[in-house]
Amino acid sequence: MGKSTESLIYDMAFRVRLYMASKISEQKVGDLTDRESLIIELVGMKGSMSISEIGSLYPTVSNSTISTTITKLWKDKKLVDKNILPENQRVTTVTLTEKGKQILEEIKHTQADVFSTISVSLGLSPDQTEYFHEILKNAIIFFDETMWLKLNNTKL
């Protein structure tokens, strides 16, 4: 028998991370760090997130680091707006500015190119593609439930 499912998932995830890192760094979008790009993507998908919601998705990163990153995206790069909720002034929400939305589109375009290359290289038949989509949907549901990440535009 070949490798275990767990081992294959690890091998694939490692290679995807390496491939994405090399391709994304070649096409650096908006001079963003990986963390900044991910925050832009999260806020873009959710529409609006509190700083604590964003921080909860980074359990190994301190709240002050997340807050500093968001402040940099707000003050220095003008990619997000920070808003204090009138009904609870202890909560600050983050939304994308128009410039942030443009950068998000660039990020998506760059990633679409990378993922398209991967998808085409698999050479799946229509039946294999349908089955593969079901596997991917199940993985997405797992991560959404594990990380409480209910994204607005995820249609499975």
What label would you give each PLM region?
Residues 1-31:
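N-terminal leader segment of winged-helix/HTH proteins
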Residues 30-36, 97, 122-127:
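Short helix-coil-helix linker/hinge
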Residues 13, 17, 104, 140-144:
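A structural signal for well-ordered alpha-helices, especially hydrophobic packing surfaces
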Residues 21-65:
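N-terminal helix-turn-helix DNA-binding core of bacterial DNA-binding proteins
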